[in-house]
């Protein structure tokens, strides 16, 4: 389980993930709460999260192709530096009293574009550092850092908002991303033999499309990722609504719900890392998908805050488990030089979350948050049953 930490580069990248993930959690919790305070509208929250997801759809494959073309270390440094500036602009707009919904939408869109380059670079860089044999351990342990710090990040962001104001989490997250810049800069570049480095980004894009058209298993994994993103990972849209209007627990409660989500994710990541190179990756993927849907239904229908936290922990376990297994299976079912583009295709798949975010927000505006979230959880259960019956090869992975 701990073998990847023998590599100094992986250890530094792990610390980078911890710092950057704390910044990400601050951004998600604080910006979602900000939008609800500005608009008092679930539909606006849906729009906000749709804008956040849209760059994945527009630039996902470009980001993956660029990760195969460029030095991944240098690309990560650029991405984290740009995150610093996004956080500072957010903070100064709030403290000046100028912040409007369109500012938040523009900044979260820019942040989303950066993420389409950062995520495939970071995930592919993990495998560069630890090798394909340790890919499951490396990716799972990296997820441990991400989910583990999210427990602190969710609760801390809510506390900072309550005690010091809405602007301070954005200044703190800028400092965290600056730490990430210095950590990545300390990693020695890993030179891997990549045919993609000899090709243009557009040629890499063409080859990415060919991978999907020729590899039916990759297509199935992308479809699962897309539907999971639409109906499962859209749930953060309504977390501020559940916290403020249904459970009546305020900004701190909103942070705690996100903390339990990360806590569940931490448990899943630790479990996957301890499994090593499991022979049942496909079955695990299907189980996580099913748990995700059931967890959302239970979370949406409990009026008791403590139970809501427990069910959100269940959602966190299944969300993190599905995320990790999806990324691992994509990287292991393509050629070595195609891993960046594989992650770009995954990024493209999760871009379909834009449809889920807008639909969930619209349903909540019209029929209430409980109904909307329950419908999406039910659709998750239906989809995984259909995938189990129609794609038998998934069970064999």
Write out the residue ranges for each language-model feature.
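C-terminal transmembrane bundle of multi-pass solute transporters/carriers
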Residues: 58-61, 69, 73-75, 79, ...
């Amino acid at each position: 389980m701990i073998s990847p930490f023998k590599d100094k580069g992986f250890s530094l990248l792990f610390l980078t993930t911890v710092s950057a993930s704390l910044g990400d959690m601050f951004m998600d919790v604080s910006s979602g709460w900000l939008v609800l305070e500005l608009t008092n509208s679930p539909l606006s929250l849906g729009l906000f999260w749709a804008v956040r997801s849209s760059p994945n759809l527009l630039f996902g494959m470009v980001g993956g192709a660029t990760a195969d073309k460029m030095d991944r270390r240098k690309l990560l440094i650029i991405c984290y530096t740009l995150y610093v500036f996004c956080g500072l602009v957010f903070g100064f707009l709030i403290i000046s009293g100028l912040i409007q919904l369109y500012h938040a939408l523009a900044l979260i869109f820019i942040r989303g574009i950066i993420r389409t380059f950062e995520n495939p670079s970071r995930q592919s860089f993990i495998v560069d550092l630890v090798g394909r044999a340790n890919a499951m351990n490396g990716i799972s342990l990296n997820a441990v850092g991400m989910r583990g710090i999210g427990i602190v990040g969710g609760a801390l962001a809510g506390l900072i908002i309550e005690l010091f104001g809405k602007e301070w989490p954005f200044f703190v997250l800028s400092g965290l991303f600056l730490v990430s810049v210095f950590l990545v800069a300390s990693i020695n570049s890993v030179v891997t033999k990549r045919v993609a480095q000899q090709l243009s980004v557009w040629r890499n894009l063409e080859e990415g499309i060919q991978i999907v058209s020729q590899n039916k298993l990759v297509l199935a994994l992308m479809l699962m990722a897309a539907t999971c993103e639409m109906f499962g990972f859209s749930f953060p849209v309504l977390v501020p609504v559940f916290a403020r209007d249904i459970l009546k627990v305020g900004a701190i409660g909103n942070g705690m719900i996100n903390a339990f989500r990360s806590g569940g994710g931490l448990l899943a990541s630790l479990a996957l890392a301890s499994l090593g190179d499991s022979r049942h990756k496909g079955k695990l993927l299907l189980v996580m998908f099913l748990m995700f849907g059931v967890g959302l239904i239970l979370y949406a229908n409990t009026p008791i805050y403590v139970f809501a936290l427990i069910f959100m922990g269940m959602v966190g376990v299944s969300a993190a488990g599905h995320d990790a297994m999806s990324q691992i299976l994509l990287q292991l079912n393509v050629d070595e030089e195609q891993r960046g583009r594989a992650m770009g295709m995954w990024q493209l798949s999760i871009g379909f979350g834009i449809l889920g975010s807008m639909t969930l927000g619209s349903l909540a505006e019209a029929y209430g948050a409980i109904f909307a979230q329950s419908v999406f959880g039910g659709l998750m259960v239906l989809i995984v049953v259909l995938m189990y019956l129609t794609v038998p090869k998934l069970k064999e992975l």
